[in-house]
Amino acid sequence: MAAIEISQVCKDYHGGVRAVHHVDIDIRDGEFIVLVGPSGCGKSTLLRMVAGLEDISEGTVKIGDRVVNQTDPADRDIAMVFQNYALYPHMSVRENLEYGLKNRKTAKTEIDARVAEAARMLQLEPYLERKPRALSGGQRQRVAMGRAIVRKPAAFLFDEPLSNLDAKLRVSMRGEIKRLQKRLGTTSIYVTHDQLEAMTLADRLVVLNGGRIEQIGAPLDVYHTPASTFVASFIGSPAMNLLNAELHGDSLAIGPSLFALNGFAPTSGPVTVGMRAEDFRLAAAGEQGFAFRVDYIEELGSQRLIHGMIGDQNLTIAFPPDVDVPAALSITIASEKLHFFSSETGKRIAGKAEQLGVQSAQMATA
């Protein structure tokens, strides 16, 4: 196991195209870090630079106490798990698990012990003599994970390992990866475009956009306090509602609706306001609220996603399945549940609720 330090790392391609811009990440020993973002955000490129499969244009990567910029991939003490399994089709499961260890001239008794341990952990014991073609997709991915585990590396690198699996199998494999990582305590970097996968696996998320870090933090911190409109729209399902609005004194204007903020206005003028679907409720008689026109409803069993409009802007709200929804209704949200972003930069504007939280934390530690 080892800490990994990524310092001011950049990646340039021919023609002056910069794919990764000055990335800094300090990964603690035993931590599970997930790099998440849309296609083309640089997450796989960054992982490949850590692995040594891509050259680093600027900056340094340190694994343990070694700077590994010029170190061959085989000598970096890492193990990778890929989307396409990368198994040898002519070898049995046992032979696939043994292969890397044999190449490193590991003693046979040690190979046998490591293979037996990995097979037991991954429930592969009944399949050790089978060829990959006789296995399901989930079983093949477990073999790929087993091949990484037997190496006992300083770090695991996962490059979208579940992308080829169906939805049900992805859920079970997510749990298996999380359980194994906690059991082994091995530092791990995991790449995915699936924000649900990222939220459920990570100790910390690194949200990437255009080759730059948008935010680093624990999953719930990123969810509840997104640093930008990009993060707000990418993390969470459904995505956070982002509406054009204007702050007038202590009131929020969204189209024709005016909403009192009770001292929570962080600034004045035009802003982008963010609202999570689950934070809305029906407004009581006489209570201030937004006029909401229903367009259509998605029934998900555990909740209803109601899509509609406030003025001329789209909005999605989430209600329990037993709530009756008329075609037009008045909805409300607590002032402290609102998120404010600059309408120019998209960056978060700290509201009074966050400022009060910081002050309370400072007083508690004083």
From Swiss-Prot:
GO BP terms in the entry: carbohydrate transport; glycerophosphodiester transmembrane transport
Binding positions (ATP): 37-44
Alphabetical list of SUPFAM superfamilies matching this protein: MOP-like, P-loop containing nucleoside triphosphate hydrolases
Alphabetical keyword list: ATP-binding, Cell inner membrane, Cell membrane, Membrane, Nucleotide-binding, Sugar transport, Translocase, Transport
SMART domains: AAA
UniProt keyword DNA repair present: no
Location(s), subcellular: Cell inner membrane
Catalysed reactions, as listed in the record: sn-glycerol 3-phosphate(out) + ATP + H2O = sn-glycerol 3-phosphate(in) + ADP + phosphate + H(+)
Residue ranges annotated for the ABC transporter domain, each copy included: 4-235
Task performed by this protein: Part of the ABC transporter complex UgpBAEC involved in sn-glycerol-3-phosphate (G3P) import. Responsible for energy coupling to the transport system.
Assembly and binders: The complex is composed of two ATP-binding proteins (UgpC), two transmembrane proteins (UgpA and UgpE) and a solute-binding protein (UgpB).
The family this protein is said to belong to: Belongs to the ABC transporter superfamily. sn-glycerol-3-phosphate importer (TC 3.A.1.1.3) family.
The protein, known as: sn-glycerol-3-phosphate import ATP-binding protein UgpC 1
Organism, as annotated: Agrobacterium fabrum (strain C58 / ATCC 33970)
